[in-house]
Regions:
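Short polar/acidic secondary-structure junctions
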Residues: 25-27, 72-73
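A conserved beta-turn-beta hairpin within the catalytic core of GNAT-like acetyltransferases
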Residues: 27-31, 77
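Conserved N-terminal beta-strand and adjoining loop/helix that marks the start
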Residues: 1-19
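Conserved positions in beta-strands of structured domains
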Residues: 14, 65-68
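Charged phosphate-binding loop/patch that engages nucleotide di/tri-phosphates or the phosphate backbone
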Residues: 125-150
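Unchanged
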Residues: 40-64, 73-124, 148-150
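Beta-strand scaffold of nucleotide-dependent catalytic cores
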Residues: 21-23
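A short gly/proline-enriched turn/hairpin at secondary-structure junctions
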Residues: 34-35
Length: 150
């Protein structure tokens, strides 16, 4: 069994110029606001993980759209995507987060509980082009097991 606890994803989900945020219930950002996300499961692609995590944590259905940023550290990586809002109203899972809600993006950026990294990601979002998922897949490879963002 592989160990995917070092591979994580988060998503910027906008609805009516409001960003989806969660208040974390654990870890180094306990009590702070961040964009929702989580770890990949074994044999799970990042876009599937993002859609699953956001649904589990907030009851919001999304579709992964583009890659905004990726952060590498010595012991992990974290990919940040945009995701299109499809349906649902935010409901916290009460396990990993105590709150889930949409907040005006300008209010989010000035909120004292927003994590520094989330603030930086939101500030940079829209200032530069994001990478879009390509339909390209090399011959002989299952498209469900391959992703290319350009």
């Amino acid at each position: 069994m592989s160990d995917n606890r070092y591979l994580s994803v988060s998503g910027i989900v906008l609805r009516d110029n409001k960003v989806l945020l969660v208040r974390q219930s654990y870890g180094s950002v306990k009590g702070l606001l961040t964009i929702p996300g989580g770890y990949l499961q074994e044999n799970e692609m990042p876009d599937d993980a993002l859609e699953r995590e956001i649904l589990e944590e907030t009851s919001i259905v999304v579709k992964t759209r583009s890659l905004v940023a990726i952060r590498f550290a010595l012991n992990d990586w974290w990919a940040i995507f945009t995701a299109d809002y499809i349906s649902g109203e935010p409901v916290p899972d009460k396990n990993e987060n105590s709150e889930a809600f949409f907040l005006d993006i300008d209010d989010a950026l000035s909120h004292p509980d927003l994590t520094y990294t989330t603030k930086e990601v939101l500030l940079q979002y829209g200032k530069k082009p994001s990478m879009q998922k390509s339909n390209f897949c090399p011959a002989g490879i299952d498209p469900k097991e391959y992703m290319l963002f350009m």
